């Protein structure tokens, strides 16, 4: 009976998501850069890896490259135009375009160009925490889904 309750999908997804975000927060706290490492789009990525692990949008490849491609589109637009209503839209549109043509669509990453542009300066939006965070989330997803839960989950 207890095993059935623990492995009830909403409970399992909630516990797994809480664990992933808590570990990211612990890593952030340990490096004394709490805010830098806690990127809001990570929350939505964790929803996909824990609640919808069979979705193609939750593949490690999509998580990693989707976030990096989207952030890069934000950096590109922040570099060549003054932040405005249209630069936000164009950056998100570019992110979607490049994620789709590379088969790396990851909807949570669509928020990254907005974060980059609204940060006020591309220097203020550090790509390192994003890269480390998405690698951590992807490794967590593989360990959770493929190794612990024995799901048919891609390595990459």
Language-model regions, residue ranges each:
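Internal alpha-helical transmembrane segments of multi-pass membrane proteins
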Residues: 82-106
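Hydrophobic alpha-helical segments of small multi-pass membrane proteins
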Residues: 91-97, 113-120, 131-135
């Amino acid at each position: 009976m207890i095993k059935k309750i623990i492995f009830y999908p909403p409970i399992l997804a909630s516990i797994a998501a809480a664990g992933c975000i808590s570990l990211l927060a612990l890593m952030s706290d340990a490096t004394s850069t709490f805010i830098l490492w806690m990127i809001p789009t990570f929350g939505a990525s964790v929803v996909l890896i824990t609640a919808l692990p069979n979705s193609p949008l939750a593949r490690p490849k999509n998580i990693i490259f989707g976030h990096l491609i989207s952030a890069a589109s934000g950096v590109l637009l922040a570099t060549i135009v003054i932040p405005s209503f249209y630069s936000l839209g164009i950056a998100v549109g570019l992110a979607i375009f490049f994620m789709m043509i590379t088969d790396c669509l990851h909807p949570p990453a669509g928020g990254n160009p907005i974060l980059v542009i609204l940060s006020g300066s591309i220097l203020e939006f550090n790509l390192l925490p994003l890269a480390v965070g998405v690698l951590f989330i992807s490794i967590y997803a593989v360990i959770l889904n493929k190794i612990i839960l024995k799901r048919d989950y891609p390595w990459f």
